[in-house]
């Protein structure tokens, strides 16, 4: 006789299975809505539908686009993109990949063992922010360095790999969505899953939309972390504490918000009214107020007071104060950048001023091509064709009778 042994789970608690099924159903329904939209513009509009309008309107193009990063962090990587744009050189894609992989965020992942639900949420948010910042950097490469074939082909392939539900960002987003209560954070889940269905063309062209997304994700994640009971001093780096407290003040998570609002209202209403017994003080204030002349408008000020604008040549410009803080992200562009910053040197081998200043002509042609066009380049050629005034022999005073010179 054959016996068939089966194993069954006789526990009556199926809340975990129902919660998992609900999460899968919510993520699946949101994904179906984006997959049903064929055009990329329709997917973008569907994402904008669930994004609230930022309080300051549209973000500027040169604003910080990294989530939970300081302005200095963003400026460092943005200057690397400007370095590639201004000084084109043969660049290895592996070098760009190393720079992209070094992009992180100021939110530290949790290292506590065993992790609590708040620690898991902190780690998931940190990973999503880091991958989002890397995606933004790749999109900026594709947007600003469109005249370099190697950079464009690399950025196009990287954007294709980093978009979609099967990418590294997609895996981390689904893990974060699984940790969120969908009833309270349905809009955030919709935005996170909507990011995965945007096309590489949208990421490369919609820089303002990226700023809108950054503002929404940063405030939503910070609100989520504070509701989970985490402390800013423990989860963020020290250099980001002031920025985090400023955002908390804006979204109303500090106790001093009400006092600050009362102070702002009192400042807008003006100074308090004086008593009847203080009429003399009011008269003195009126006399002083009427005695001071009204300041002139900028357009009515004398023109001599304005500072004239002078154009300084590139070789005479002084380095900025924070030049030591700037770092070259791409070493292969150092040679080109050093040539552009080099001062022109004048050589005088024969002593008669016959040798032309080739280095000065090259620098003038480079400046003319960037600023004034072909007219300035012709001027640069004429300047280079004339002998340098520094090599002209000086005239000596004649004390003896004038005699004819024999050449």
From Swiss-Prot:
Residues 273-286 have a biased composition (Acidic residues). It is found in: Host nucleus. The gene is UL34. Keywords: Host nucleus, Transcription, Transcription regulation. One of its GO terms (cellular component) is host cell nucleus. Disulfide bonds: none annotated. Residues 287-301 have a biased composition (Basic and acidic residues). Residues 268-330, 388-407 are annotated as: Disordered. This is Transcriptional regulator UL34. Acts as a transcriptional repressor of the US3 gene expression through a specific DNA sequence named the transcriptional repressive element (tre).
């Amino acid at each position: 006789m054959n016996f068939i042994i089966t194993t069954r789970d006789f526990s009556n608690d199926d809340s975990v299975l129902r919660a998992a099924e609900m999460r899968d159903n919510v993520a699946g329904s949101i994904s179906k809505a984006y997959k049903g939209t064929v055009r990329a513009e329709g997917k973008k509009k569907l994402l904008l539908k669930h994004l609230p309008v930022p309080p300051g309107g549209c973000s500027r193009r040169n604003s910080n686009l990294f989530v939970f990063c300081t302005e200095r962090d963003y400026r460092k990587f943005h200057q690397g993109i400007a370095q590639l744009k201004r000084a084109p050189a043969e660049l290895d894609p592996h070098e760009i990949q190393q720079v992209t992989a070094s992009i992180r965020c100021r939110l530290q992942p949790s290292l506590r063992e065993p992790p609590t639900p708040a620690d898991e949420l902190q780690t998931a948010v940190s990973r999503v922010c880091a991958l989002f910042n890397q995606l933004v950097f790749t999109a900026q490469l594709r947007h600003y360095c469109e005249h370099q074939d190697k950079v464009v082909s690399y950025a196009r392939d990287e954007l294709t790999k980093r978009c979609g539900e099967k990418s590294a960002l997609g895996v981390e987003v689904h893990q974060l969505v699984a940790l969120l209560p969908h009833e309270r954070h349905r809009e955030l889940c919709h935005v996170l899953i909507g990011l995965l269905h945007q096309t590489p063309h949208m990421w490369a062209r919609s820089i303002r939309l990226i700023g809108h997304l950054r503002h929404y994700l940063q405030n939503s994640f910070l609100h989520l972390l504070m509701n989970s009971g985490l402390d800013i001093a423990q989860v963020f780096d020290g250099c980001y504490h002031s920025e985090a407290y400023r955002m908390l003040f804006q979204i109303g998570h500090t106790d001093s918000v009400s006092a600050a609002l009362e102070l702002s209202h009192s400042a807008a209403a003006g100074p308090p009214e004086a008593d009847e017994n203080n009429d003399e003080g009011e008269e003195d204030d009126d006399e002083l107020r009427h005695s001071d002349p009204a300041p002139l408008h900028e357009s009515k000020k004398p023109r001599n007071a304005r500072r004239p604008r002078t154009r300084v040549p590139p070789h005479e410009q002084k380095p900025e104060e924070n030049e030591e803080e700037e770092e070259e992200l791409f070493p292969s562009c150092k040679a080109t950048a050093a040539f552009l910053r080099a001062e022109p040197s004048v050589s005088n081998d024969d002593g008669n001023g016959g040798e032309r200043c080739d280095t000065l002509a090259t620098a003038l042609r480079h400046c003319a091509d960037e600023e004034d066009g072909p007219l300035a380049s012709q001027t640069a050629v004429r300047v280079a064709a004339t002998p340098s005034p520094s090599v002209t022999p000086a005239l000596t005073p004649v004390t003896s009778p004038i005699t004819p010179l024999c050449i």
